[in-house]
């Protein structure tokens, strides 16, 4: 799920799992800023911040940034969103967004990771970048003894649920635990990924998540892991550094919105 700007797609026929090579910046590049918002962030404020930061990174006036946030309950519609997939349109606010993909949910208990990296200094390959983001999630889950998997026909990270009834075709049921939706402008990424830590999974009922029917959603707590967001953040950072290289802490996270659930 991505929306690159014009002329930014390279034709690649390899599977995503085969695309993982080096996504490190050159050795002389400064570490990526790692920012954690101290309070919930209004979605429109987040978009404006990403737009500004991505422009500064492209201009060479700011270092790359990873920004971890939570949002109040809301739905976002990507550039491929089908109106029929918004099942309960008045449940939460709905935001049209420039990222690729379809409908998704953000809310309390979900870690949203906005990734603003300059792929010109890393690797100008959109599919490889998406695969690298999946690898960050998979490594994060692996550190908690959860096996996350990618699927070639579905972007994101999935967890098998053998304890659930099998699918109609007899295969093992599987739920989505993390979603990815990105956009590129001048080869700088923004938007990013979301990992379900302990959101209210019933809030996903208002949409067909990512336009994919027949599969459910899950979270770390739903899988039986009583984890805290701060613990997940540490593991996310370690996994990110394995894939993309060093980071440095930044403390001026932005957060103003209130977390309000139905």
Curated annotation (Swiss-Prot):
InterPro entries documented for this protein: aa-tRNA-synth_II/BPL/LPL (IPR045864), BPL_LPL_catalytic (IPR004143), Octanoyltransferase (IPR000544), Octanoyltransferase_CS (IPR020605)
GO molecular function: lipoyl(octanoyl) transferase activity
Annotated metabolic or biological route of this protein: Protein modification; protein lipoylation via endogenous pathway; protein N(6)-(lipoyl)lysine from octanoyl-[acyl-carrier-protein]: step 1/2
Biological processes annotated in GO: protein modification process
Binding site residues for substrate: 99-106, 179-181, 192-194
Gene3D superfamilies, per the entry: Bira Bifunctional Protein, Domain 2 (3.30.930.10)
Cell location: Cytoplasm
Keyword entries, A-Z: Acyltransferase, Cytoplasm, Transferase
Chemical reaction(s) catalysed: octanoyl-[ACP] + L-lysyl-[protein] = N(6)-octanoyl-L-lysyl-[protein] + holo-[ACP] + H(+)
Residues the record marks as site: Lowers pKa of active site Cys: 176
Active site location: 210
Domain BPL/LPL catalytic: 60-248
PROSITE patterns, sorted: BPL_LPL_CATALYTIC, LIPB
Lineage top rank: taxon: Bacteria
Gene Ontology terms: cellular component: cytoplasm
Disulfide cross-links: none
EC number from the UniProt entry: 2.3.1.181
Pfam families xrefs: LplA-B_cat
Similarity remark: Belongs to the LipB family.
Additional free-text comment from the UniProt record: In the reaction, the free carboxyl group of octanoic acid is attached via an amide linkage to the epsilon-amino group of a specific lysine residue of lipoyl domains of lipoate-dependent enzymes.
Role according to the record: Catalyzes the transfer of endogenously produced octanoic acid from octanoyl-acyl-carrier-protein onto the lipoyl domains of lipoate-dependent enzymes. Lipoyl-ACP can also act as a substrate although octanoyl-ACP is likely to be the physiological substrate.
Protein name, as recorded: Octanoyltransferase
Gene label: lipB
